[in-house]
């Protein structure tokens, strides 16, 4: 099918929202997402059917093709016919490796349905559970595709009955997850049911697949599958692919089970839009109204070497046209659209307009970042934006980088800036003391890929330090009230600190409690769910990005209101670098009990207020059993039953903890936790001790206190690395 014709068809169909489906392909790493996408693209005439499954068209970065994993979420609009009608399917292929799960979270926001790909042999892995949970939290309806069914025949040599049992077991596990994480009103309706047709069995690599209704209609059963793989020649396999093409099975199911934007936005907008649902913007979104005001949710920023920054996202209402002026809610500025296009894999095809319900790529919004909301400029005073995206992981590993050739320094700084625009989970910082450029990522692979992108896209070779694990500082007890004085002695603050309980940390981390919410609503939740005193909770005035809160319990302090912004800035600065090892502070409640403020503004500027606030917080911190928190990783390991002992030995050696061991057929599943600091050579150790027969997944689990037995050693090493004095600060150092 000639490509220009497809683009024309796609553009004309986009206007009929009942014919649009926004779907993503999500899975654990290596379960076959990109191969599945390729097979779908081949059917739409976008890549040659002969190379589908090997072309990895959506893995268009060379780093992806070399490593065989998807790093970026790639978009494409497909044309598909079902029951005589044409449909536009906006397809997003997302990364499965846990280091890139931030990109999955962003792409889910713009989808209405997801194809969950599961390897028939490996079954449900850590990342499958994570992405399915994220999908359900965003009210994205799942369809199941059990891929690599050929492995059950070729590798495990199962009989038809054993194959059926294995497949039913995977379906049961997926339904358990839907039951666990789905919302009450969707659970029943979204359960996976083979009879209904929302589960596909197949092999993306060999291009065949079917649902039960399709198999019954075409007279196919599992015996045909076994015959195709046990036959001496390939003709039976080709016959199977011709009789049950995978693209037909998957796209027909997507059209039948994934709602169109009009249906989906009615129940998804109340979940993801935080703002009044009765205003004109919200009403237009609830109806996916192409004639309403524009609301464009940006999920991805890409640097195009020829065109500059390209913003990709979903049009929830209105119609995007070039020349249109939009207000960027987070950046608080307006910008004009220079060009509107849609993605066909790595290439962008120009479009005159893209209406509500579709995915668009836009030039001109170079001040936007991932997670930005762009709206019609006349609505800039309307309160509301999309709910903050919750990333399952956070950056936990850091390296220092410098260019091999010192002349490349400005080029490297510019390239790092561009990389961090494209990937908000990559944090770039400058160490003020040493002048080093620090790069923090979600894991070792995330940083490796970023360095490879620096080399390939920007031609910069860099020298790096070995990876450093990121820590947090925290406390385990309540402090007394300490007085912090400003350097000129004219301002005094009386503050105390105490640890936040686990429930409060959870409520803030998952976005239930936000700094910008109504104080009464916040106080009610904290009282009912986290045992707070209602009046104290009502007086929370700041929550920072590392889950620390500031409570103002003062009454009638003169001039406090005029300096409160400076006080809060001082609080945020203190939380960025704690006294133990200059690592960020996490999980601390700071209470302001009283203050004395000088009446003359000249004597109460930031240079006076910041140190006074910081000193009393740090004095309290050092008397409250301070500790370091280290990032802990969850491991999900599958291994033949006779090798359990080898795996548990590796985990125990790395300060790990076995959480669960279960048996599935002749494979054992081990769930465990280990500190990220011990995981650097985990892959080679596991491979070595099991002869390469273990496969596993990892994800960020939680922050946990460093054991007391090694605490001082870890703190000393961090202080040495940062060039800080060897001896720890004392309380007296902060009390002048």
Swiss-Prot record:
The family database entries (Pfam families) matched by this protein are listed as: EFG_C, EFG_III, EFG_IV, GTP_EFTU, GTP_EFTU_D2
Q: Where is the tr-type G domain?
A: 18-234
Q: Write down the InterPro entries for this protein, in alphabetical order.
A: EFG_II, EFG_III/V, EFG_V-like, EFTu-like_2, G_TR_CS, P-loop_NTPase, Ribosomal_Su5_D2-typ_SF, Ribsml_uS5_D2-typ_fold_subgr
Q: Where along the chain is GTP bound?
A: 27-34, 93-97, 147-150
Q: Which UniProt keywords apply?
A: Cytoplasm, Elongation factor, GTP-binding, Nucleotide-binding, Protein biosynthesis
Q: Which GO terms describe its molecular function?
A: GTP binding; GTPase activity; translation elongation factor activity
- Mark the residues carrying the PTM Diphthamide: 603
Report the protein's function.
Catalyzes the GTP-dependent ribosomal translocation step during translation elongation. During this step, the ribosome changes from the pre-translocational (PRE) to the post-translocational (POST) state as the newly formed A-site-bound peptidyl-tRNA and P-site-bound deacylated tRNA move to the P and E sites, respectively. Catalyzes the coordinated movement of the two tRNA molecules, the mRNA and conformational changes in the ribosome.
Say which family it is in.
Answer: Belongs to the TRAFAC class translation factor GTPase superfamily. Classic translation factor GTPase family. EF-G/EF-2 subfamily.
What's the protein here called?
Answer: Elongation factor 2
> Which organism's genome codes for this protein?
Saccharolobus islandicus (strain L.S.2.15 / Lassen #1) (Sulfolobus islandicus)
The uppermost taxa in this organism's lineage are: Archaea, Thermoproteota, Thermoprotei, Sulfolobales, Sulfolobaceae
């Amino acid at each position: 099918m000639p490509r220009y014709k497809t683009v024309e068809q796609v553009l004309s169909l986009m206007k009929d929202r009942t014919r649009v489906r926004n779907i993503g392909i999500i899975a654990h790493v290596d379960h076959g997402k990109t191969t599945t996408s390729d097979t779908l693209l081949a059917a739409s005439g976008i890549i040659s059917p002969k190379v589908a499954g090997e072309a990895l068209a959506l893995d268009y970065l060379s780093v992806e093709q070399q490593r065989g994993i998807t790093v970026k979420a790639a978009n494409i609009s497909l044309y598909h016919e079902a029951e005589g009608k044409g449909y536009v399917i906006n397809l997003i292929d997302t990364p499965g490796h846990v280091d890139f799960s931030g990109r999955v979270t962003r792409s889910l926001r713009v989808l209405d349905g997801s194809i969950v790909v599961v390897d028939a042999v490996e079954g449900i892995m850590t990342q499958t559970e994570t992405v399915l949970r994220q999908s359900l939290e965003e009210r994205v309806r799942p369809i199941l595709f059990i891929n690599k069914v050929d492995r059950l025949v070729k590798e495990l040599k199962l009989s038809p009955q054993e194959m059926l049992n294995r497949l039913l077991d995977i379906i049961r596990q997926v339904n358990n997850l839907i039951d666990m994480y789905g919302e009450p009103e969707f659970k029943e309706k979204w359960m996976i049911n083979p009879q209904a047709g929302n589960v596909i069995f197949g092999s993306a690599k060999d291009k065949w697949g079917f649902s039960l209704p399709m198999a019954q209609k075409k007279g196919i059963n599992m015996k045909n599958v076994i015959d195709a793989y046990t036959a001496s020649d390939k003709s039976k396999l080709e016959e199977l692919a011709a009789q049950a093409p995978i693209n037909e099975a998957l796209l027909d199911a997507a059209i039948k089970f994934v709602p169109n934007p009009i249906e989906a936005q009615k129940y998804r907008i109340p979940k993801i839009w935080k703002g009044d649902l009765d205003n004109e913007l919200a009403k237009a979104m609830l109806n996916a109204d192409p004639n309403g005001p524009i609301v464009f949710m940006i999920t991805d920023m890409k640097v195009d070497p020829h065109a500059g920054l390209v913003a990709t996202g979903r049009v929830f209402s209105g119609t995007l046209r070039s020349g249109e002026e939009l207000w960027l809610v987070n950046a608080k500025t307006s910008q004009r659209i220079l060009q509107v296009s849609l993605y066909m894999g790595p290439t962008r095809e120009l479009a005159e307009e893209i209406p509500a319900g579709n995915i668009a790529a836009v030039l001109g919004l170079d001040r936007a970042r991932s997670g930005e909301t762009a709206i019609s400029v006349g609505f800039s005073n309307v309160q509301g934006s999309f709910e903050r995206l919750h990333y399952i992981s956070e950056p936990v590993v850091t390296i220092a980088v410098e260019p091999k050739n010192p002349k490349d320094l400005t080029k490297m700084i510019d390239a790092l800036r561009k990389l961090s625009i494209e990937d908000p989970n990559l944090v770039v910082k400058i160490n003020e003391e040493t002048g080093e450029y620090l790069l923090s990522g979600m894991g070792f692979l995330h940083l490796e890929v970023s360095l490879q992108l620096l080399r390939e896209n920007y031609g910069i070779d860099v020298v790096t330090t070995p990876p450093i694990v990121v820590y947090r500082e925290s406390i385990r007890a309540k402090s007394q009230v300490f007085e912090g004085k400003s350097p000129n002695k004219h301002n005094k603050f009386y503050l105390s600190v105490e640890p936040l309980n686990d429930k409060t940390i959870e409520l803030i981390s998952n976005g239930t409690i936000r700094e910008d919410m109504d104080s009464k609503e916040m106080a009610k939740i904290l009282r009912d769910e986290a045992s707070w005193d209602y009046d104290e909770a009502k007086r929370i005035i700041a929550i920072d990005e590392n889950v620390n809160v500031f409570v103002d319990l003062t009454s009638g302090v003169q001039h406090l209101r005029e300096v409160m912004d400076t006080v809060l800035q001082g609080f945020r600065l203190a939380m960025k670098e704690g006294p133990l090892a200059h690592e960020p502070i996490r999980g601390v409640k700071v209470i302001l009990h009283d203050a004395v403020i000088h009446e003359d503004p000249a004597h109460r500027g930031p240079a006076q207020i910041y140190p006074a606030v910081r000193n009393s917080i740090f004095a309290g911190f050092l008397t409250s059993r301070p500790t370091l928190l280290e990032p802990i990783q969850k491991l999900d390991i599958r291994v033949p039953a006779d090798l359990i002992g080898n795996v548990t030995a590796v985990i125990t050696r790395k300060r790990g903890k076995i959480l669960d061991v279960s048996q599935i057929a002749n494979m054992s599943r081990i769930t465990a936790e280990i500190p990220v600091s011990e995981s650097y050579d985990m892959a080679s150790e596991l491979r070595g001790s099991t002869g390469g027969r273990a496969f596993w997944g990892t994800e960020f689990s939680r922050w946990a206190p460093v054991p007391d037995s090694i605490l001082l050693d870890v703190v000393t090493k961090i202080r040495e690395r940062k060039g800080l004095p060897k001896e720890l600060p004392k309380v007296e150092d902060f009390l002048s």
